[in-house]
Amino acid sequence: MFCVIYRSSKQDQTYLFVERREDFYRVPADLMAHFGKPLFSMILPLDGSKKLASADTGKVKELFKEQGFYLQVPPPVESLLAQHQRAEKNLIIDPCILASE
């Protein structure tokens, strides 16, 4: 079994996996409209000989059987506030600097 991977023309880091090239008949029309024009990326075997970058091969196979495609979306972006708060917690203040003030 192979998967054909397309990247989205509208959504950054979003990929659509289908079983055959140009075979989008099982992908819902709303999803295709949101995805934009599929831009061919590559064809990979799903036999375990090659590892998928961000997807589990077993999950891709399972969803091919259930719905005929697999959609890979980017991980959620951490808010800038959360990044700032985490950085503040990890901030180490040199006591020598405080003593000189």
Swiss-Prot record:
It comes from the Bacteria. PROSITE patterns: YCGL. InterPro entries: YcgL-like_sf, YcgL_dom. Transmembrane segments: none annotated. Residues 1-85 form the YcgL domain. SUPFAM superfamilies: YcgL-like. HAMAP family: UPF0745 (MF_01866). This is YcgL domain-containing protein SG1337.
